[in-house]
Amino acid sequence: MTENYRGCYEYLSAQYPEVGGYEFYKELFPDNENSGERHTDFSHPNAVYLYRDEQSEDKKLRRRKMYNDTWEHDYMEFVEGNSLTLCSGLAYRRKENRLENAQRMYALIFDLDGVGLAELRNLFLRFGGDPERVRRLPMPTFLVLSGTGLHVYYVFQQPIDLYPNIKIQLKSLKYDLTFRMWEYGSTSQVKAIQYQSINQGFRMVGSLNDKHGTELVAFRTGERVTLDYLNAYAKPENRVDVNKPFSPSKMTRAEAREAYPEWYERVVVNGEKGRKKWDIAGKVHGDDPYALYHWWLRQIGEIKGGHRYFFLMCL
């Protein structure tokens, strides 16, 4: 047992109720099929998890659907005490837990490594604060001790249907909140931020982290959330709009030339496929002589741990 794990367990167990693994996943995925049911219209997607087959010689990872009526037995047989089990916050069509098969999101989950008692306390100073303030974070539904840090669960009041455009938007939202959450020297002891897919699998509650010999333990820290609640903590361009239609542009080349003449000249005529460079001289000698300074001010929420003094120097 690491010092980080021990300190975080003592802190959380003194303030929040512990939730067992069986109950945790029953609450997370209340709509799983019963064994033997077959819905060909994809109306009942299931959670899918991976577990290490301790009986096989090669200790191979095997995939299994999470069924409602057999979950108690399956949890004790395949998850509890297992050295490696993985499950995401999504439900899938068919048995493969691939992103293209993902149909609903029940929870948005974050992996935060390098969390000790000091980092955990800093997180709680930020959880539930004013979303307009820098680095404030939504209050999670559950915190899970992973052995090396925390798994942060935001469980939705209603699952999110994963249309292709919604998957893309949720990825942007997760990346935005990951940046807010992971701050070296404050909320994590690890410098490099780890950005993960919305389809990422996480070690399951009640299983063991075989690298550290610790059990994954969950604590209920808050309520279920809505997309609007999470959106409030992200930049406007990274928020999820479930009503936003996904349709490719039907604009013709002639219409694009008329509507976006500068872009057309640069990309179509001149073949410049790279990103447009910022014309600093043109900005400074244009309407805003302090354009560069104002640009740096807008980056205040993007500064990574270890670079704050450089940011202040630029100002």
What spans do the regions from the language model cover?
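DNA replication initiation on ssDNA origins
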Residues: 1-107, 117-122, 129-134
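Non-membrane alpha-helical secondary structure
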Residues: 4, 17-20, 169, 222, ...
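Catalytic "initiation/cleavage/transfer" segments centered on a nucleophilic residue
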Residues: 70-71, 185-269
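Residues at beta-strand starts and edge strands
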Residues: 104-106, 148-150, 310-312
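Histidine-centered divalent-metal-coordination microenvironment in nucleic-acid enzymes
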Residues: 110, 136-165, 169, 195-209
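Anionic group-transfer/hydrolysis microenvironments
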Residues: 113
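Helical (often loop-to-helix) elements that flank the catalytic cores of nucleotide-handling enzymes
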Residues: 118-130, 156-186, 212-232
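Modules that initiate DNA replication and primer synthesis
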Residues: 158-160, 241-315
